[in-house]
C-alpha cells in the first residue's frame, strides 16, 4: 500500500478526533477523541519511519502509547470523580468543581 494512503488515513482520523473534541460535551467522548488524535499521530510517525527506513518514528510512537496509557488511567479517574460528584460526565459541570 502506498504511504500516502496511510498519511491520508492519519489526517482523516486526526480530523475526526478534533471535530469530536470541539463538538461534543461528554467528557468520555472527548477523551476517546483525544486518544483517536494521538493514534493518528502515531500512524503518521510510523509511516514516516517506514518511508525513511529508520526506527525513530516507531520509537516515538511507542513512547506516545506509553504516555497515552498513563493519560487513560489519570483521565478516567478524574472523569469518574466528576461523575460521582455531579452525576454527569458533561464537561460544563467540571468547571463547578472549584466551588
Swiss-Prot record:
InterPro entries: NADH_UbQ_OxRdtase_chain4L/K (IPR001133), NUOK/Mnh_C1-like (IPR039428). GO terms for biological process: ATP synthesis coupled electron transport. Its EC number is 7.1.1.-. It holds the Pfam family Oxidored_q2. Disulfide bonds: none annotated. The keyword Glycoprotein does not apply. It is a multi-pass membrane protein. One of its GO terms (molecular function) is quinone binding. PANTHER family: NADH DEHYDROGENASE SUBUNIT 4L-RELATED, NADH-UBIQUINONE OXIDOREDUCTASE SUBUNIT ND4L. NDH-1 is composed of 14 different subunits. Subunits NuoA, H, J, K, L, M, N constitute the membrane sector of the complex. NDH-1 shuttles electrons from NADH, via FMN and iron-sulfur (Fe-S) centers, to quinones in the respiratory chain. The immediate electron acceptor for the enzyme in this species is believed to be a menaquinone. Couples the redox reaction to proton translocation (for every two electrons transferred, four hydrogen ions are translocated across the cytoplasmic membrane), and thus conserves the redox energy in a proton gradient. Belongs to the complex I subunit 4L family. This is NADH-quinone oxidoreductase subunit K.
Amino acid at each position: 500500500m502506498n504511504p500516502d494512503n496511510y498519511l491520508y488515513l492519519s489526517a482523516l482520523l486526526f480530523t475526526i478526533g478534533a471535530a469530536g473534541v470541539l463538538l461534543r460535551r461528554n467528557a468520555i467522548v472527548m477523551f476517546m477523541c483525544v486518544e483517536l488524535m494521538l493514534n493518528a499521530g502515531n500512524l503518521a510517525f510510523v509511516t514516516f519511519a517506514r518511508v525513511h527506513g529508520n526506527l525513530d518514528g516507531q520509537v516515538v510512537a511507542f513512547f506516545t502509547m506509553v504516555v497515552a496509557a498513563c493519560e487513560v488511567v489519570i483521565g478516567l479517574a478524574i472523569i469518574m470523580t466528576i461523575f460521582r460528584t455531579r452525576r454527569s460526565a458533561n464537561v460544563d459541570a467540571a468547571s463547578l468543581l472549584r466551588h
